[in-house]
Amino acid sequence: MASLIYRQLLSNSYVTNISDEVNEIGTKKTTNVTVNPGPFAQTGYAPVDWGHGELPDSTLVQPTLDGPYQPTSLNLPVDYWMLIAPTREGKVAEGTNTTDRWFACVLVEPNVQNTQRQYVLDGQNVQLHVSNDSSTSWKFILFIKLTPYGTYTQYSTLSTPHKLCAWMKRDNRVYWYQGATPNASESYYLTINNDNSNVSSDAEFYLIPQSQTAMCTQYINNGLPPIQNTRNIVPVNITSRQIKDVRAQMNEDIVISKTSLWKEMQYNRDIIIRFKFANSIIKSGGLGYKWSEISFKPMNYQYTYTRDEEEVTAHTTCSVNGVNDFNYNGGTLPTDFAISRFEVIKENSYVYVDYWDDSQAFRNMVYVRSLAANLNDVVCSGGSYSFALPVGNHPVMSGGAVTLTSAGVTLSTQYTDYVSLNSLQFRFRLAVSEPSFSISRTRMSGIYGLPAVNPNNSAEYYEIAGRFSLISLVPTNDDYQTPIANSVTVRQDLERQLGELREEFNSLSQEIAVSQLIDLATLPLDMFSMFSGIKSTVEAVKSMTTNVMKRFKTSSLANAISDLTSNMSEAASSVRLTSVRSVGTITLPRARVSLQVGDDLRSMQDVSTQVSNVSRNLRLKEFTTQTDTLSFDDISAAVLKTKLDKSTQISQQTMPDIIAESSEKFIPKRSYRIVDEDIRFETGIDGTFYAYKVDTFNEIPFDMERFNKLITDSPVLSAIIDFKTLKNLNDNYGITKKQAMELLHSNPKTLKEFINNNNPIIRNRIENLISQCRL
């Protein structure tokens, strides 16, 4: 049978080389993965010997002394020592707060007996008594008066051979050095208003911050060193000193090191990231009440913004990882609203935004180290989506929100429609926010996260502001661009090609001949016959087959097959007899509808959910058991083969995903039969379940206890012609018992006879299965 292709893909082993494994790992995004290849993370191949490059000969030393400054009058900055260095005796400095404090400092040379000298202080001629008994030290004397016309009184002295004194304004006080060197120490004498206290210096001076008080004390006691590192070579006016808060430039290019061929450049950039989510909403076939999938898709977005008066063109790609699958089943009837799967991102999810712009920083982004970024948070709020049902009120899914917080940045490659770009990938972790999301007219409410149904909420884009910095090894010649080698990237975006291929595959369903499909489904398709219609070389077919097997081995079907034993045992034990006692013996569809109220409705829905889970595992059991009957997988493989032959867009890169996806998504509404003498049990993945007699097609009570025993021992058959179709065929056309048995066993010869006779019921059923072969 045609499903042989799926069995071969699962059972055949394959070989691969390490580069294939690395590329495969690189294309998958996983959470909590840190790559540390050394001091540099590169997207290509770094030089074999990468040194630090050329280093400057000189060493920059932060100046200790801020000065010297010319004699002047100023409002001394708070928390700064004013270190005064006079060269001769006389008035050194004076100051006042203009209300109740006037102070002055004079310098007296050695060997001066008690004498009276005249000084000009505060604009007045003042007679002061001074003395200095030392023969080697000079004496600084501090005088203070409390009224404008009061008398100056001596408060403190400092004896030193170095002719250095210092004072400082701090905490509304004036601090001053006193005593004799080398044991002079600081003290305070005045309480003043710092804001209005001016100081006038008659000698050159330096400014030393309070944090370097120990250095100032060393100068007072030991003098200035013979050679000083000063801010100014010669004394300058204090107005040339402008104390400003210096902030790092956000957008700058700094040369770290340089040789003849290479240089290291540090790029600092502010950044505005704008991104959008994309989604896919797929409606199931049938009456129009079912949706098969609502999922997130990668989204490219291009925009411009202004950075330092320069217009920047940027490109982002947004994708998600670690999604959570939800579903909703409103009931067992074909007119009950249901969503087979819809994706929601929550705390365990990640959002990836790949960013590139046309600035110099991205021109040679091949060899990069010291990559860092700081970004703001952003809240993404979901909008509303109305599910348009053919009849009745429309359910509306609305709400949901998550907060995106930066969780790291790494190198990546964006694949646009025309070019691949080395870019930065920003990773965001998620936290759920208010409001929760719900589906109106259902019991699904109060769930937190952001559903894929309308993640942008009619917003043009989401925006994040921040900055990044990196050091890149680039050619010394700015006109030369580093060639980009084949990269091992964090993600490779083939979604555009796959999207176009999916659309083509879905449109080809109408071109498939039903009778030819049955013939093809009975053929033992192997891997090479499956790919025989694809124009390619023999080597390409071998490589393609290997890639298909690798991808198929990680598909949902392959993972489910590996756990078949545990799945079947769990499925069998999950359906309990007690779970359907409240339903009783359900014989007709009308009776089932009449019982769907209150507790009976809830019990029916519980059984429907459990039966749906069992039916999925029945597919696995049938898949591992080869029979001569036709199965859903035979039809699925035949449709796949037909579409591959007709496709014009299939390629070696997209083939593995298409093969794996078809095994998971083709014919989502399947039913399976279990044989029990003259009784057939039929259960569907959509939750429907029937038990009926073979000879009359009359429905009988569904014996759950008997069903539990049969699902582990009896053979499983695909209900290609399901119970409703058989009953409709028998009621309208009448069929023999032999035909009934062959249709129940999905005999391909009998199916083809009905199709060739243009039986509308059988033909419509097969056409419906073909229409369900969608991606």
UniProtKB/Swiss-Prot annotation:
One of its GO terms (cellular component) is host cell plasma membrane. A motif (YGL motif) lies at residues 448-450. Keywords: Capsid protein, Coiled coil, Disulfide bond, Hemagglutinin, Host cell membrane, Host cytoplasm, Host cytoskeleton, Host endoplasmic reticulum, Host membrane, Host-virus interaction, Membrane, Outer capsid protein, Viral attachment to host cell, Viral penetration into host cytoplasm, Viral penetration via permeabilization of host membrane, Virion, Virus entry into host cell. Disulfide bonds join 318-380. Residues 510-775 are annotated as: Spike foot. GO terms for biological process: permeabilization of host organelle membrane involved in viral entry into host cell; virion attachment to host cell. Residues 389-409 are annotated as: Hydrophobic. Residues 484-511 form a coiled coil. It holds the Pfam family VP4_haemagglut. Residues 248-479 are annotated as: Spike body and stalk (antigen domain). Residues 65-224 are annotated as: Spike head. The record marks 231-232, 241-242, 247-248 as: Cleavage. This strain probably does not use sialic acid to attach to the host cell. In group A rotaviruses, VP4 defines the P serotype. Belongs to the rotavirus VP4 family. This is Outer capsid protein VP4. It comes from Rotavirus A (strain RVA/Human/Japan/K8/1977/G1P3A[9]) (RV-A).
